[in-house]
Amino acid sequence: MKRKVKKMAAMATSIIMAIMIILHSIPVLAGRIIYDNETGTHGGYDYELWKDYGNTIMELNDGGTFSCQWSNIGNALFRKGRKFNSDKTYQELGDIVVEYGCDYNPNGNSYLCVYGWTRNPLVEYYIVESWGSWRPPGATPKGTITVDGGTYEIYETTRVNQPSIDGTATFQQYWSVRTSKRTSGTISVTEHFKQWERMGMRMGKMYEVALTVEGYQSSGYANVYKNEIRIGANPTPAPSQSPIRRDAFSIIEAEEYNSTNSSTLQVIGTPNNGRGIGYIENGNTVTYSNIDFGSGATGFSATVATEVNTSIQIRSDSPTGTLLGTLYVSSTGSWNTYQTVSTNISKITGVHDIVLVFSGPVNVDNFIFSRSSPVPAPGDNTRDAYSIIQAEDYDSSYGPNLQIFSLPGGGSAIGYIENGYSTTYNNVNFANGLSSITARVATQISTSIQVRAGGATGTLLGTIYVPSTNSWDSYQNVTANLSNITGVHDITLVFSGPVNVDYFVFTPANVNSGPTSPVGGTRSAFSNIQAEDYDSSYGPNLQIFSLPGGGSAIGYIENGYSTTYKNIDFGDGATSVTARVATQNATTIQVRLGSPSGTLLGTIYVGSTGSFDTYRDVSATISNTAGVKDIVLVFSGPVNVDWFVFSKSGT
């Protein structure tokens, strides 16, 4: 009997230990527990358990914390956060920051995220920090952003006739999804909202922001042991009651008004992480106090977006004051597509309050007045065409997503450029004439930049063909010949596609050089000329690349491409040329004088070298050439060129 009792006691001990281990592995629910769909407030936070069917348990703990379990569900959401009245934008609420920590154990499809809704427009949004077996949302990303030290991919999806806070509806979903999972940290929610709006993903009036665990046809449990939501840091400032004097000829941000009669007007996000005003209706007025017009202004420009044709009256001192002029605004295509429109106004001098009177819906980013003499005379206000002009130092631009950003090594550049965008640089002084332009650019795809005088539809001076540099962070100089102009002009760069631009500079016309009179800056024909040191080139895909053993070469060449090398000094004469090349296919290189269609001096016949990494020297006879000449290499097919050199007559 004693042995049997001992065995039974041992078995009981083992069972108890097993039960303790099992209990230790399952979250202990000790707070207020709910099992089915319910909303309310708890610990100063709004909570909700929502499911379509299945087994769910949610424990409401102190503050924003909670734990949850789910199994055999279709879709279930557990969340604690803050709800609003759908009467304020995120800018008006101020910065929204979530600090969180979660023991997250999904089995199948699930998300750990910040979740919420906006109204007008109706948007369901997710900032996904971690996930289960499937990374949402299974769509093509619109781009990437970096927030809180992490990289997120951005998505936009459409839900048609699906459940929403307003019943069954069709609405947009916005997603930020981390490229690597995490289950604790800080989420700067407002920064995500700003980046979404930069991409044209318009936010409405805030309904909710909550830390959320969502499950979909899965099971699992989670313990949110930290969830602190801070709202209200750095809100949009209220209109100033004691305005200082403002310069009419500097940009005035539309949201920096002093008073309005509107009950619907709101401060909204604009591209480039800016702000503006929107939700404007017929009869709304906005007043800006103490605008200093100095000796006079006769023009007005505003950056606006609208889907309907409308107009804005510009009045002095009151909504019924002197009508200075009317700005007629045509549809820009969408509420997120901003364009600058201008109008003449009656001359106004001194200091006045300015009132904008609206006839219908429009979003306004900013506005500015122009002086009575809108085109300054050449002089101290001009820019030297032959000194580097930073791309970000434009006087005006077109393109809602265009941005100025910092470069890793210092300085700034412009990017987020799309087809049809443009930047204008006023009062560029070309003095006695120019010959070419060089721009420092980076792009992952081939594109082009038109150089125009007098506006985006002005005289076309030339086109810069930009090959892929392989990365948005890999910058190269590209050059193009331009039609000659003299004096002072406004220059506009018109873009045909995505490209980052650091700076550009023009090259003056060399009025002193002649074909037989070498001048400073000439290059000896009898020393190696590096192929990448061309003065201009033709061919959208041509690239400069690094060689394994050091140095550079040109490649990605196609039939009809060419490179030009200026001021090559042949002295008393040269009769042959040698080039160091690599190619997988036989091809030819014509050596021409002056231009791609100039006098043919000779042709280099290039046999296959076995690969594009195997370089050999090939030679050809050319017509005797003396003096200083511009030399053009014209290619008939793919080849990489390291350098070339000419040989003197008789050698």
From Swiss-Prot:
Top EC category: hydrolase
Keyword Electron transport: no
Binding site for D-xylobiose: Y279, N336, N363
InterPro entries: CBM6, Cellulose-bd_IV, ConA-like_dom_sf, Galactose-bd-like_sf, GH11/12, GH11_AS_1, GH11_AS_2, GH11_dom
EC number: 3.2.1.8
Domain notes: XynA is a modular enzyme. The number of CBM6 (carbohydrate binding type-6) domains varies between strains. The polymeric substrate can interact with several of these CBM6 domains.
Residues reported to bind Ca(2+) 2: Q530, E532, S552, D642
Reaction(s) the record says it catalyses: Endohydrolysis of (1->4)-beta-D-xylosidic linkages in xylans
Pathway(s) per entry: Glycan degradation; xylan degradation
GO cellular component, one term: extracellular region
Record protein name field: Endo-1,4-beta-xylanase A
Pfam families listed in its UniProt record: CBM_6 (PF03422), Glyco_hydro_11 (PF00457)
Binding site for D-xylotriose 1: T270, Y279, N336, N363
Lineage, top ranks: Bacteria, Bacillati, Bacillota, Clostridia, Eubacteriales
Keyword match Repeat: yes
Active site (record annotation): E124 (nucleophile), E214 (proton donor)
Function recorded in the entry: Endoxylanase that degrades arabinoxylan and glucuronoxylan to xylobiose and xylotriose (in vitro).
Domain named CBM6: residues: 250-370, 387-507, 527-647
Segment forming the signal sequence: 1-30
